[in-house]
């Protein structure tokens, strides 16, 4: 599952599967750390996700091969009759320089996961190029391994109209077009439209006031 940031990928997956996720992990953003420090932080975070899922671990793994071995140990303890659902969010962030993540993931998938008929792995990411190059168009160990591809796009203008109607936001079509040109079809942004204000007032308070919810959004992306 891939698409631009804020489009609703994580929301869609988590709300679809709800409490059926066997293992859920969100990668750390690579913006603040780098090199070996970032790799260790990612591995520690992966360990924390395993612990939250119920696995007892004494120390964090030192490589992605060790990390996926721990994941195999955890998943192997689940009943064969139970559907195992693994969700890795922002997977591209795990592939830090010289981390060996892709090679380790290939080994995990081809050496164990592909043989588990009850396993579903959902890989999600905002870095579209990475998803396409490393997963969808992979020519190595992950060649033709993806069974379902979903590119989540922003809402169309018609879908925006349906969204606003469902959420009690009254706008004529002229204002809907104006709103679409301002914030697009991104559900996250659309959720901030307050039906108690006019479109102009909403845009002003969200984008142009000092503490507006979307004033600094461009820089964050």
Say what each PLM segment does.
Residues 1-221:
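Phosphate-binding site recognition
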């Amino acid at each position: 599952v891939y698409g631009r940031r804020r489009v609703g990928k994580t929301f869609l997956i988590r709300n679809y599967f709800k409490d059926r996720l066997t293992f859920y992990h969100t990668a750390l953003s690579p913006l603040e750390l780098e090199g070996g420090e970032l790799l260790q932080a990612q591995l520690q975070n992966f360990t924390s996700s395993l612990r939250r899922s119920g696995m007892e671990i004494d120390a964090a793994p030192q490589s992605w091969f060790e990390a996926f071995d721990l994941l195999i140990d955890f998943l192997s303890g689940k009943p064969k009759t139970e559907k195992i659902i693994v969700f890795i969010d922002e997977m591209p962030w795990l592939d830090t320089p010289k981390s060996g993540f892709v090679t380790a993931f290939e080994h995990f998938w081809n050496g164990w996961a592909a043989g588990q008929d009850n396993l579903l792995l959902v890989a999600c990411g905002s870095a579209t190029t990475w998803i396409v190059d490393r997963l969808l168009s992979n020519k190595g160990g992950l060649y033709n391994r993806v069974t379902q591809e979903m590119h989540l796009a922003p809402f169309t203008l018609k879908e925006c109209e349906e969204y606003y109607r469902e959420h009690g936001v009254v706008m004529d079509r002229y204002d809907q077009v104006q709103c679409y040109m301002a914030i697009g079809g991104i559900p996250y942004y659309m959720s901030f439209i307050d039906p108690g204000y006019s479109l102009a007032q909403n845009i002003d308070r969200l984008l142009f006031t000092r503490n507006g919810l979307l004033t600094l959004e461009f820089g964050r992306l």
